[in-house]
A protein has these predicted regions:
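Rossmann-fold NAD(P)-binding glycine/threonine-rich loop
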Residues: 84-93, 97-118, 123, 441-450, ...
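Alpha-helix N-cap/helix-initiation motif
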Residues: 14, 147-150, 358-359, 409, ...
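Flexible glycine/proline-enriched surface loops and loop-helix/loop-strand junctions
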Residues: 138-149, 217-220, 491-501, 572-576, ...
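Active-site PLP attachment segment
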Residues: 116-126, 150-154, 471-482, 501-509
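N-terminal glycine-rich dinucleotide-binding loop that anchors FAD/FMN and/or NAD(P) in oxidoreductases
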Residues: 45-56, 393-408, 479
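Acyl-CoA thioester-binding alpha/beta core of soluble enzymes
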Residues: 1-41, 55-107, 130, 134, ...
């Protein structure tokens, strides 16, 4: 059963991010019709497969008039000359949600700057962090594999558009910035910069986070491990057959492992090179230590886990039948009653979310739900609560939520949780498989107290299949999926890198939650969602998955491109300052030659000739860039119409006139915190993140109707921590 049966989407133009938005909608059952689609690349052909095309003026008008959601992509100047300007779309259909995607948003001084995947990753700051910390700053920053700016932008558009389409916001308009969608993946770093705290440095300091998660060489590749807790470290030593150095005081406790990381990694590597990557991961998992092998994308095309979950479906592409991803979640839908849309100023006004999630992925999901107006009640354990509280993570992801402390080891606390679930619309949890069931808070158990509850579970591998109980973290899953292995320069070993998987999954989950609400409203069905983070990773890695099956398996290429030349990054004057430059056409090449004097004699070169002359072009751009400030160099190229961007630091984004003009930042005490990657005509909810348990009494009184005397009894019993 699909979530969006009867939901009609019109996708206008050839933009990749709009195509991703339409692909996600189609994968969960929407009827997607394209106007002027582009199938010029394998990725676009994949994204637009199976969608209807409105080829005539009559068909286009009819599709637009019937649409629930219209999505289009491009900077404002492109739409000004288009027949699909907003007033015309409103004349045809006054009630549809219209989502406009663009590189830098529809407003602000950078709104019409030319941009590409590479330059957006530079401008967002994500390229500075993607590889993690490096030993040598001469190693160039890179973009990730597979046009990921389109996937992140498309997910943001789908999330915002789905919420706006829930029924209480007819005629909503949404402006999605791909630049902001990328930047907001790094919530912790944005918050640190906004609050004036110490910011992240690309130069490796200490262990470079290795004591938390690292990659070890194996006899046939690499394996990622994450024995971040002392208990896990003890188990990891057992998995390595209790080496003599395991009791060395240099490596106990974790603070000492951080301090002596290079020596420790060398010792572990000596052991790991004797074993194959899957054996290491299996041995670690048997000891409940999070670990996965670094796989090639091709290794995921036929696995017992994905077969069990029916993840792939056949599709014809480029004259060949290949396997393509389906939805990254299992879905069961129980019959129920149709429910009216929320009433209030925001899409989720009046909706209650019971939030059992922690750290990044789940709290990112509920951050979006809170911003869209839901009352989010965050259930935390006594003591320190969500580990995200130890950093700025909770400060930003906890915004506009409520916090209640429940000690779920106490039966009375479990009963309180059940009572709250009985009065909630959505439950979100990302505990290890089996935990909620053992507590009596699983989907089946709560169905008895609230048949209308939408129950969303997120886990590394999904709740079913032979790997369902594997211990996983998002950073390990991006290694397992093949993402980390491809995101590197050809001559450099893979790194874990930036925690990409978790915030990406959180964004996708927020879309799924809104889609499930719409299904409950229109069909009466109540969804049980079993979300798999590895499947979500592979869904966004469609380009390498498809290329592998069409005979061109991807390899690590750094910033190289076969479609554009030049396409790369060059070091500028200053401390670890870089510029990215992309030339997409002969006209842009001639413009570049007009800015960089040393290229003037090459102005007549076409694409093939520029690829052949790569070394000479690189040398000229290297000499030109190294004497200039990155921002100055980028501005000179942008003024000539050439996509370019300086490698942003998060502090640069805090000071950005463009983001200020777009009101991206929210005031927070003496600093600022990042907002959402879209501007909606209906706005969003704001508010500070709660202290641990700050709302316990209020929630128990207002939601459950408990007296102060009863609350005092529960607190004395330990149920409230």
């Amino acid at each position: 059963m699909t979530l969006l049966a009867g939901f009609k989407v019109v996708q206008i133009g050839g933009g990749s991010a709009a195509a991703v938005c339409g692909r996600l909608m189609a994968d969960v059952g929407a009827q997607v019709t394209c106007i002027d689609p582009d199938a010029g690349t394998t990725l676009l052909a994949y994204l637009n497969r199976g969608k209807a095309v409105a080829a005539t003026a009559t068909d286009r008008h009819a599709s637009l008039a019937a649409a629930d959601l219209i999505v289009r992509e491009g900077p404002p100047k492109e739409w000004a000359a288009s027949p699909y300007v907003l007033p015309e779309l409103r004349r045809i259909n006054a009630s549809a949600t219209v989502v406009t995607l663009s590189p830098y948003g529809a407003t602000g001084p950078r709104a019409n700057d030319p941009a590409t995947d590479l330059t957006l990753f530079f401008a967002s700051g994500i390229s500075r962090q993607l590889l993690g910390q490096v030993d040598d700053l001469s190693e160039a920053p890179i973009r990730p594999v597979g046009e990921q700016s389109a996937f992140i932008g498309g997910l943001a558009a789908a999330c915002a558009g789905m919420h706006a389409s829930l029924g209480n916001q007819p005629g909503a308009s949404i402006d999605v910035s791909i630049h902001e969608a990328l930047s907001t993946l790094a919530m912790t770093e944005l918050a640190r910069a906004g609050l004036g705290h110490k910011s992240w440095d690309r130069k490796r300091l200490g262990d470079g986070n290795g004591a938390t998660v690292t990659i070890l060489p194996a006899s046939d590749g690499y394996t990622a491990i994450s024995p971040r807790e002392e208990k896990q470290w003890t188990s990891w030593l057992k998995a390595m057959d209790s080496p003599a150095w395991g009791n060395d005081p240099r490596f106990v406790p974790k603070a000492n492992r951080v301090k002596n990381w290079d020596a420790l990694h060398a010792l572990m590597s000596h052991w790991s090179r004797l074993h194959d990557k899957q054996w290491i991961a299996d041995t670690a998992q048997r000891e409940h230590v999070p670990s996965f092998p670094l796989r090639e994308v091709s290794e995921h095309l036929d696995t017992p886990q994905l077969r069990h979950r029916g993840y792939y479906r056949p599709s014809d592409l480029a004259g060949k039948t290949i396997q393509v991803p389906s939805t990254p979640f299992g879905l069961s839908v129980a019959a129920g009653r149709k429910q009216d849309a929320a009433k209030g100023p925001l899409p989720l006004s009046g909706m209650r979310v019971l939030d059992f999630s922690w750290v990044i992925a789940g709290p990112t999901t509920t951050r979006y739900l809170a911003a869209m107006g839901a009352e989010v009640i965050k259930v935390e354990a006594p003591g320190s609560g969500d580990p995200g509280r130890a950093t700025e993570l909770h400060t930003v992801l906890g915004q506009a939520k409520k916090s209640i402390v429940l000690d779920l080891k106490k039966p009375q606390a479990v009963e309180l949780a059940r009572a709250l679930a009985a009065k909630s619309d959505i439950l979100v949890e990302n505990y290890a498989t089996g935990v909620m069931d053992r507590l009596g808070l699983g989907a089946e158990a709560l169905k008895a107290v609230n048949p209308a509850l939408i129950y969303i579970s997120a886990s590394g591998m999904g709740r079913t299949g032979p790997e369902a109980r594997a211990v996983a973290y998002g950073t390990l899953l991006q290694c397992y999926a093949g993402f980390a292995g491809l995101n590197r320069h050809p001559d450099i070993a893979p790194r874990v890198g930036f925690a990409w998987c978790d915030p990406m999954c959180g964004l996708m989950l927020a879309f799924v939650a809104a889609a499930a609400l719409r299904h409950r409203q229109h069909e009466g069905g109540v969804a049980r969602v079993d979300f798999s983070m590895i499947e979500a990773m592979l869904w966004t890695m469609a380009e390498p998955l498809v290329a592998t099956q069409l005979g061109t398996p991807p390899k690590p290429v750094g910033n190289a491109s076969t479609r554009h030349a030049p396409h790369g990054v060059w070091r500028c004057a200053g401390d670890d300052d870089w510029i990215s430059v992309v030339v997409r056409s002969d006209a842009e090449w001639r413009a570049l030659c007009g800015v960089v004097p040393g290229l003037a004699g090459m102005a007549a070169l076409d694409l093939g000739q520029r690829i052949e002359a790569k070394d000479a072009i690189d040398a000229t751009l290297t000499a030109w860039a190294v004497t200039r400030a990155a921002s100055t160099a980028a501005d000179s190229l942008l003024s000539a119409g050439i996509p370019a961007a300086a490698l942003a630091r998060y502090g640069d984004l805090v000071k950005s006139p463009h983001l200020a003009a777009r009101e991206f930042w929210d005031e927070h005490g003496a600093g600022v915190l990042p907002g959402l990657p879209w501007r909606a005509s209906f706005g969003r909810a704001t508010g500070p993140a709660p202290d641990l348990g700050a709302d316990s009494d209020q929630v128990l009184t207002n939601v459950l109707g408990l007296s102060q005397e009863r609350i005092a009894e529960l607190r004395t019993s330990g149920a409230l921590g």
